[in-house]
């Protein structure tokens, strides 16, 4: 019985740590950027209205559609390109 309780406790800790990583602060969206190795970025929701950011999203839709195994919004471009585009939006 003690083993079951300790396993349940470990499961709760793991689910909390996973939720903490995947949660984005209010007003932000987590995106994964890169071609082979993905890096997580938090972008303001206001970027969704910007044509240059929408172009990146269209590229993502063309490559992955709406069902990507990573589970998050993935943008398949070089990190430098993403930083260049988003730095102009600030």
From Swiss-Prot:
Induction: By auxin.
Highest rank taxon of the organism: Eukaryota
Main location group: membrane
Record GO biological process: auxin-activated signaling pathway
Protein name as catalogued: Auxin-responsive protein SAUR22
Name of the coding gene: SAUR22
Membrane topology: Peripheral membrane protein
Keyword S-adenosyl-L-methionine belongs to the record: no
UniProt KW RNA-binding keyword: no
Function of the molecule: Functions as a positive effector of cell expansion through modulation of auxin transport.
Keywords for this protein: Auxin signaling pathway, Cell membrane, Developmental protein, Growth regulation, Membrane
GO cellular component labels: plasma membrane
Compartmental location: Cell membrane
Native source organism of the sequence: Arabidopsis thaliana
Family: Belongs to the ARG7 family.
């Amino acid at each position: 019985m003690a083993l079951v309780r300790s396993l349940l406790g470990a499961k709760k800790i793991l689910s909390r740590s996973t939720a903490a990583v995947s949660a984005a602060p209010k007003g932000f969206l987590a995106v994964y950027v890169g071609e082979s190795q993905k890096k997580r970025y938090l972008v303001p929701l206001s970027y969704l209205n910007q044509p240059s950011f929408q172009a990146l999203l269209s590229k993502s839709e063309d490559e992955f559609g709406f069902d990507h195994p990573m589970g998050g919004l993935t943008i398949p471009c070089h990190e430098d390109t993403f930083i260049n585009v988003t730095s102009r939006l600030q």
